[in-house]
């Protein structure tokens, strides 16, 4: 997250020209995912774009499967949130074998030397995940400037001071 923090504080373009952040961090691509969790989508007008993109891809949106973990504040996108920029962190979901794949990866490889390029990957799942994120990004690029939802905690904490 150090690199994301540096970039969010020292962007190569004016911060005001960054309208949203779409974070692709650690999707588990070892199974045919049928759902995703979009952390933060419900906090801003990014949410409807995510819903439309997922519907076009026939991918279900699932709620946070581990809300006590605070995942919305634990990835690169949060550094942009701290700068007042709406963000979404999309990851593969727990349906269709996803929970087992996630828990196995966490137990066996997460932050361990075995987390390397020798791990299996389903390239069809990778292509689907990339396409979904492209669809989300295209929606955001072609639509109105994203805005925080009125009364959102992170909007009140970070967006108003920018």
Annotate each predicted stretch with a short phrase.
Residues 1-94, 98-100:
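Metal-dependent peptidase/peptidase-like ectodomains
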Residues 16-21, 48-52, 116-120, 138-139, ...:
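Short, surface-exposed, polar/charged, turn-prone segments marking secondary-structure boundaries
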Residues 91-160:
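His/Asp/Glu-rich mid-to-C-terminal helical/loop segments that flank catalytic regions of hydrolases
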